[in-house]
């Protein structure tokens, strides 16, 4: 929303195209994506429930977080949902805020851990390794000349990346299930250096 309303750029932990397989793995069978634009931003919370959730999607159950806010100027909350649906046969499930010994689990906390290069604790919160994709672009070929082919990756500018440094990583090529043990250098020009090479690694190195 802040990108649309205030032209603010916020790097994302998961790009839209990355969320789909994650949701599928969680058991989501159907997904309706509603693009957020200025017209939608002016829709009141009550009208969002009536026009979209009830009339369009014919919702029978609504699940939201305990601190959920929505609608024009974030005016809607759980009580808004209760009042608007009180005469309808719609179930409301409220998801408690998740916490651990370190405090509230949130995307801001994950970003902070990644910025500090603390991928182990980020993994514990996400329950999966943090990953990203890139397009191989031509490099100087120095690694290949030394016997260690490297893939110079151009990363989507919308993606949040861990802090600069050198990481042990697993790489895959074109969604292959074959994982390649790698050393990844994240800097102003992120690269992946393949430790264990193959014909495919040689082919895609630059």
Regions found by a protein language model. Give the residues of each.
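A residue-level signal for conserved active-site and pocket-lining positions in enzyme catalytic cores
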Residues: 23, 122, 169
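Hydrophobic pocket-lining residues within nucleotide cofactor-binding pockets
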Residues: 36, 97-98, 200-201
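Core alpha/beta nucleotide-donor-binding catalytic domains of modification enzymes
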Residues: 1-57
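Classical nucleotidyltransferase
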Residues: 42-149, 164
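Short secondary-structure boundary segments
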Residues: 35, 66, 186-188
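Phosphate/ribose-recognition catalytic cores of enzymes acting on nucleotide-derived substrates
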Residues: 139-198, 205
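Flexible, glycine-rich phosphate/dinucleotide-binding loops
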Residues: 2-3, 101, 206
């Amino acid at each position: 929303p802040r990108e649309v309303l205030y032209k603010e750029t916020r790097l994302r932990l998961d790009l839209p195209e990355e969320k789909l397989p994650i949701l599928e793995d969680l058991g989501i069978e159907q997904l309706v994506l509603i693009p957020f634009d200025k017209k939608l931003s002016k829709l009141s919370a009550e009208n969002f429930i009536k026009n979209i959730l009830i009339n369009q999607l014919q919702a029978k159950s609504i699940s939201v977080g305990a601190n959920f806010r929505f609608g024009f100027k974030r005016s809607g909350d759980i009580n808004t949902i209760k009042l608007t649906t009180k005469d309808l046969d719609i179930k409301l499930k409220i998801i408690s805020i998740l916490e651990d010994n370190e405090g509230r689990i949130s995307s801001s906390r994950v970003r902070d851990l990644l910025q500090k290069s603390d991928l182990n604790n980020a993994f514990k919160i996400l329950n999966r390794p943090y990953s990203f994709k890139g397009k191989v672009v031509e490099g100087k070929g120095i690694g290949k000349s030394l016997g260690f082919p490297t893939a110079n990756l151009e990363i989507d500018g919308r993606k949040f990346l861990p802090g600069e440094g050198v990481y042990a990583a697993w790489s895959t090529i074109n969604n292959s299930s074959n994982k390649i043990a790698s050393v990844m250098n994240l800097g102003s020009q992120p690269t992946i250096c393949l430790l264990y090479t193959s014909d495919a690694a040689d082919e895609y190195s630059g």
